[in-house]
Amino acid sequence: MADDLGDEWWENQPATAGSPELSGGEEGGDTEMTQKDTVPVPEKTKQPTECFLSQVKEPKTEDSRKSRKWKKKKISDILAKSEPKPGTPEDLQKLIKGHYSSSRSVIELEELHLPDSCFLKCNDLTHSLSSYLKEICPKWVKLRKTHNEKKSVLMLILCSSAVRALELIRSLTAFKGDAKVMKLFAKHIKVQEQVKLLEKRAIHLGVGTPGRIKELVKQDGLNLNPLKFLVFDWNWRDQKLRRMMDIPEIRKEVFELLDMGVFSLCKSDSLKLGLF
């Protein structure tokens, strides 16, 4: 029976129906699984992160700079745009009113108003000191000869510093003649030394700072009653382009000196004021 079957009986045996299907099913299953495995998984879209370092800064406009930073106007800038104007009696009147407005009543302020008659002709910025003094005081020689009272002067010139006082004294040569001139400032000169000099002989002309002159009046070293002319070095400017009345300390001392009888002397018409 074994011989009937033959040696290669398996080769002629029909393939079972399930075999191809199984093989095909396996192949299809593998293909299907492969396709599933090879489908790309969609990646999550990343939101762009904002980098603060890479941001481009917008240039600041001129308007924003101006609003943040305000530059104070300098006197030099103001003078560069306008011509210098000589001082006037109205300038002094305004300063007096502004200085005393917070401490004096309305009636007292009216009493401090200086009469126009007490003001001499002002410097129009064309004069030297000698030429200006000759114009406002043509009878100086006669006054100088008749003045013999000690502890007093005929004319006072107020300025802002000792250095400026020395400059003014040097420029007085053409005017003073034989008049005795005295330095009235604090630099290198003690008050007591100046008091002794004023007691020793009659002085015709004094040039100095309001602070030292005020101190001499306080110590009875200087009597203001014989004074005939009080001249302010009004228009001159220092290295910072400040006039003497632009400096708060000097301005305060000037008004303190005016309070020591100058106002009453002006109203009695015995004292004249000049703005050089």
From Swiss-Prot:
SUPFAM superfamilies noted in UniProt: P-loop containing nucleoside triphosphate hydrolases
Phosphothreonine modifications at: T209
Phosphoserine carried by residues: S19, S23
UniProt-annotated stretches for the region Disordered: 1-91
Gene3D superfamilies given in the database record: P-loop containing nucleotide triphosphate hydrolases (3.40.50.300)
Alphabetical keyword list: Methylation, Phosphoprotein
One Pfam family of this chain: CMS1
InterPro entries, A to Z: Cms1 (IPR032704), P-loop_NTPase (IPR027417)
Feature: compositional bias, Acidic residues: 1-10
Omega-N-methylarginine: residues bearing it: R164
Assigned protein family: Belongs to the CMS1 family.
PANTHER family with a match to the protein in the record: PROTEIN CMSS1
Name by which UniProt lists this protein: Protein CMSS1
Species this chain originates from: Rattus norvegicus (Rat)
Lineage summary: Eukaryota, Metazoa, Chordata, Craniata, Vertebrata
